[in-house]
């Protein structure tokens, strides 16, 4: 995939990372792939810079809504990461659980462990950009989603069967990508996007050429004009190479 990104950039095409991950973690991917400096991060709630190692734009959720949402997931006992700018707020229990599979530098350098995230953000008036909630129990996810959706000022979505993501209703990857395009001197009418899950829908809807990964959900495939190979088959590289060929 890094080779395809390099070929695209050499031919004058901008390639940016658009992800649900926080700035530090997204930066790891951007450096590995060799993409442009600007990134859409935190599911569209933030724009970030690889070189500056920080958010350049934030759309945070209302303070009270963020505290209430954190309290809900803490009460149910679900592991959660709360994104506040460049910092990931987690509890000691979250740290143990996420630590089982997260060891990348971006995660380790971003995390801040506090006894209660809900209490911490309420006491310190922390602006929250996103919450990432994970569970292997589908019943718990349904229960949490039902409770979270009753809180005004937030939007609940998912990027996989085992998670929930919470952001402000004003933010999505499509809006953020539009802002990023303007920074690059272009617009969404000249943009393509590649996605596979619910949190990609707004971005795919916003661009001129929406491309579904081969492993994408049915909702994503139905929305897209084109389908590429799966993640396992380097579908992103295949999609980029086809765009290079068409613009050659």
Q: Where are the regions that the model predicts?
A:
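Residue-level signal for inorganic ion chemistry
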Residues: 8, 19, 43, 131, ...
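Short active-site oxyanion
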Residues: 12-16, 36-37, 130, 189-191, ...
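Short, structured coil segments at secondary-structure junctions
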Residues: 33-35, 42-43, 51, 151-152, ...
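Conserved acidic, metal-coordinating active-site core of Asp-based
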Residues: 72, 76-79, 83-194, 198, ...
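Active-site phosphate-binding/coordination module
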Residues: 2-102
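Mg2+-dependent phosphoryl-transfer enzymes with acidic/Ser/Thr/Gly-rich catalytic loops
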Residues: 164-248
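A generic "binding-loop/recognition-motif" signal
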Residues: 1, 22, 43, 86, ...
């Amino acid at each position: 995939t890094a080779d395809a990104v390099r070929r695209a950039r050499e031919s004058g095409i901008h390639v940016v990372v658009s992800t649900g991950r926080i700035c530090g973690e997204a930066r790891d991917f951007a450096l590995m792939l060799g993409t442009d400096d600007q990134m859409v991060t935190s599911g569209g709630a933030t724009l970030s810079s690889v070189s500056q190692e920080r958010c350049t734009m934030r759309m945070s959720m209302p303070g009270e809504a963020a505290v209430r949402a954190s309290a809900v997931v803490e009460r149910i006992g679900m592991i959660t990461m709360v994104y506040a700018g460049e910092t990931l707020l987690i509890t000691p229990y979250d740290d143990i659980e996420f630590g089982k599979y997260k060891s990348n530098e971006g995660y380790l350098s971003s995390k801040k462990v506090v006894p209660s995230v809900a209490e911490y953000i309420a006491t310190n008036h922390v602006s929250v950009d996103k919450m990432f909630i994970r569970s292997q129990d589908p019943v718990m996810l349904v229960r949490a989603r039902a409770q979270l959706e009753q809180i005004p000022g937030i939007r609940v979505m998912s990027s996989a069967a085992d998670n929930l993501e919470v952001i402000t209703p004003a933010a999505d990857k499509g809006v953020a990508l539009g802002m990023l395009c303007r920074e690059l001197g272009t617009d969404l009418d000249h943009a393509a996007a590649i996605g596979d899950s619910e949190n990609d829908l707004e971005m795919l809807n916003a661009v001129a050429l929406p491309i579904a990964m081969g492993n994408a959900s049915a909702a994503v495939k139905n929305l897209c004009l084109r389908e590429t190979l799966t993640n396992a088959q380097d579908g992103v590289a295949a999609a980029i190479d086809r765009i290079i060929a068409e613009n050659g």
